[in-house]
Amino acid sequence: YEMLRSLVGSEMCIRDRAYAREDASSFIHKGVIYNIDKTAQALTSIINKLESQLNNSIAKVYVGIGGQSLRTVKNAVSRVLEEEGIISQELVDAISDENLEVPLMDMSVLDVAPQEYKIDNNLQADPVGVAGKRITGNFLNIVARASLKKNLEHSFEQAKVEIADLLIAPIALANAVLTESEMRSGCALVDFGADTTTVSVYKNNILRFLSVLPLGGNNITRDITALQMEEAEAEQLKLKYGDMLYEEEETETPAVCTLEDGRSIELNVLNDIIDARAEEILANVWN
């Protein structure tokens, strides 16, 4: 189920001091806010719960932004100098500013991951101080539907909660769980969520690709309901017995789980359903 979650940490590290959540499945879907009023009410409830646990007031919050429309778009900006010279910081800043002017239909740039700069025929991570006549800046723009950020800000404003900073959730996650060595040598971080799966690719300590797929754990839950049960019970079975690496033991009596209505379901049947959908999600990740 879609949930609004909040965690209060301390001393600039992941240290749980307070935690609260609210069911948001009726007004947030695949990370997108569809009802600002209800979202604001849920935020107010979460803040009240956290302040009660902390016995203190919350002045500002850091907010992770994600959602189905979040993705990366490549862009390149070139400048040709009148004569060969030294690339200045001012020129690099001007190229970066021009990159933000790229027209995007119904989308907005949330952040930028500079890739490399090409000076004449040579690639440079830091072009300032390099001699050349032509410079091309390659950028990876992190974009999303303009309404994604707007609705998020409106919800917090209506809840009278001040945002200290908006963080790109997949990037914040990568910074928390990936090592510098992993980012440098190259890796993909796959975050399986309830309604979406996020893929982030890193190489040479730089984000190279980001995409949010509209598939997640809830798809598996809905598949399990085909065994004639409610979604809530399907979710419980998935969490308790689900195992994508499940291998049936060769016994006369197969392992089973018992449903609320007394029926029994073989674990291999349950896990075949889970495995089929998980394979589909992973196939989309690799593609």
What are these regions (language model features)?
Residues 10-188, 206-208, 217, 230-232, ...:
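Nucleotide/phosphate-binding catalytic cleft detector across ATP-hydrolyzing
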Residues 185-226:
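Glycine-rich phosphate-binding loop of actin/hexokinase-like ATP-binding domains
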